[in-house]
Curated annotation (Swiss-Prot):
UniProt family annotation: Belongs to the short-chain dehydrogenases/reductases (SDR) family.
Job description of the protein: Component of the microsomal membrane bound fatty acid elongation system, which produces the 26-carbon very long-chain fatty acids (VLCFA) from palmitate. Catalyzes the reduction of the 3-ketoacyl-CoA intermediate that is formed in each cycle of fatty acid elongation. VLCFAs serve as precursors for ceramide and sphingolipids.
Organism: Kluyveromyces lactis (strain ATCC 8585 / CBS 2359 / DSM 70799 / NBRC 1267 / NRRL Y-1140 / WM37)
Entry superkingdom: Eukaryota
Name used for this protein in its record: Very-long-chain 3-oxoacyl-CoA reductase
Enzyme Commission code: 1.1.1.330
Keywords, in A-Z order: Endoplasmic reticulum, Fatty acid biosynthesis, Fatty acid metabolism, Lipid biosynthesis, Lipid metabolism, Membrane, NADP, Oxidoreductase, Transmembrane, Transmembrane helix
């Protein structure tokens, strides 16, 4: 009897040991698979950023008289999109709020590049039907194949959501979301027709932000507006793939601009010129956004930052949220102190 019990005990122990071995091998296999996956994705990111060539813009109508529409074109990133697309041979339709800046940019580009530049000064924060009628009219009859949705607005300084001015909240949603969607919808029939006429592809680039990638305390409205553009761009990319129109969301971290209030560029904070150059050279490549559809993080330092966050703590983690909270709270405190000093001087 004792021998039988010992035998049963040994069998049970053997089974438990075997189960533990199987579990250990499963965990080991999953770990190896994850490491291989990360290594492949990292290698692909490096290839996208530094090795693989940029796109041939002939596929978007370059050399066929095609037009590119750029919103928010009078300053910063939008201005650079206009200049660099002009150098690639595209005619332009430039849309922005300040007519004097558009007139100046039009003269500069037409002198340097010998292309046709049309301008339209409208305030998209008003969300009037007249705006979209004017856009339709200025683009009427022109072979539009590229749309750069660059216009955007953020908070003047980081601010708690319940202290956000209603006017600022409404402007952010109207400019970043409503206007972007309405401009795209207004021009989309023309893009589809131009693609067929010129026998090329179309392109819609929309400016996203790390503020949308990472939920950002003290920029809650802006953060939500940019996160919306991620889902919208992904959905639109699926819809338009059969129409030969490429749709991409472009993610950026800090860039020297009026919106960021950063004046000096560095290795980690590019100028608009450097950022747009990397963007146009990365169309069709994911760069730092390897796990995301129809999305690119094109500038090298932004791409590395994105890759690390996505593959460590995660963009929706409490750790990432806490770091973002502390960072933007610090910015808010400095901005309030600066405003206080300026008020005392007056």
């Amino acid at each position: 009897m004792v021998a039988l019990i010992d035998q049963l005990y040994n069998v049970t122990a053997l089974r438990e040991c075997s189960s533990l071995n199987v579990a250990a091998w499963i965990v080991f296999g999953l770990g190896i698979s994850k490491m291989v996956f990360l290594t492949l994705n990292f290698s692909k990111m490096v290839l996208d950023l530094f090795v693989l060539p940029g796109p041939d813009f002939k596929k978007y109508g370059k050399g066929k008289g095609a037009y590119a529409v750029v919103t928010g074109a009078s300053d910063g990133i939008g201005k650079e999109y206009a200049k660099q697309l002009a150098k690639r041979g595209f005619n332009l339709i430039l849309i922005s709020r300040t007519e004097s800046k558009l007139v100046e940019l039009k003269k500069e580009i037409e002198t340097e590049c010998k292309i046709d530049v049309k301008i339209l000064a409208i305030d998209v924060s008003s969300d009037s039907k007249e705006n979209y009628t004017l856009i339709r009219e200025v683009a009427s009859g022109l072979p539009v194949t590229v749309l750069i949705n660059n216009v955007g607005k953020s908070h003047s300084i980081p601010v708690p959501f319940d202290q956000t001015e209603e006017s600022e909240l409404r402007d952010i949603i109207t400019i970043n979301n409503t206007a972007t969607l309405m401009i795209t919808q207004t021009l989309l029939p023309q893009l589809k027709a131009s693609v067929k006429t010129l026998k090329c592809r179309g392109l819609i680039l929309t400016m996203g932000s790390f503020g949308g990638l990472l939920p950002t305390p003290f920029l809650a409205t802006y953060s939500g507006s940019k996160a919306f553009l991620q889902s919208w761009s992904n959905a639109l990319a699926g819809e338009l793939s059969s129409d030969s129109i490429d749709v991409e969301l472009v993610l950026s971290y800090l860039v020297t601009s009026a919106m960021s209030k950063i004046r000096r560029s560095s290795a980690l904070i590019p100028s608009p010129k450097a950022f747009v150059r990397s963007t146009l050279n990365s169309i069709g490549k994911r760069c730092g956004a390897q796990e995301r559809f129809a999305t690119s993080t094109p500038y090298w330092s932004h791409a590395l930052y994105h890759f690390i966050i996505e593959n460590t703590v995660g963009v929706y983690s409490k750790i990432a949220n806490s770091i973002n909270y502390s960072f933007h709270l610090s910015i808010r405190k400095r901005a309030l102190k600066k405003a206080e000093r300026q008020a005392k001087k007056q």
